[in-house]
UniProtKB/Swiss-Prot annotation:
Gene Ontology process terms (BP): brain development; camera-type eye morphogenesis; negative regulation of transcription by RNA polymerase II; neuron differentiation
Localization annotation: Nucleus
Superkingdom to which the source organism belongs: Eukaryota
A Pfam match: HMG_box
Disulfide-bonded cysteines: none
GO CC term, one of those recorded: nucleus
Keywords in alphabetical order: DNA-binding, Nucleus
Keyword Nucleus belongs to the record: yes
DNA-binding region: 1-69
The protein's name in its UniProt record: SRY-related protein AES2
Gene Ontology molecular-function annotations: DNA-binding transcription activator activity, RNA polymerase II-specific; RNA polymerase II cis-regulatory region sequence-specific DNA binding
InterPro entries to which the protein is assigned, alphabetical: HMG_box_dom (IPR009071), HMG_box_dom_sf (IPR036910), SRY-related_HMG-box_TF-like (IPR050140)
Amino acid sequence: VKRPMNAFMVGSQIERRKIMEQSPDMHNAEISKRLGKRWKLLKGSDKIPFIREAERLRIKHMADYPDYKYRP
């Protein structure tokens, strides 16, 4: 069972698609670097929708898998 996505991953999922459409030949490592920089520059208020979605996913995950324990 996978862990639920955090706020960065929720936002990155959307942005990654946009970047891949604009630059289909860009390597995944470069896309990840750009996403990290964009996230760091994003204001706290702009992150709120992603934080809320991540929280919703976390709560759903807890309901779906009540005995889940993260084991790396």
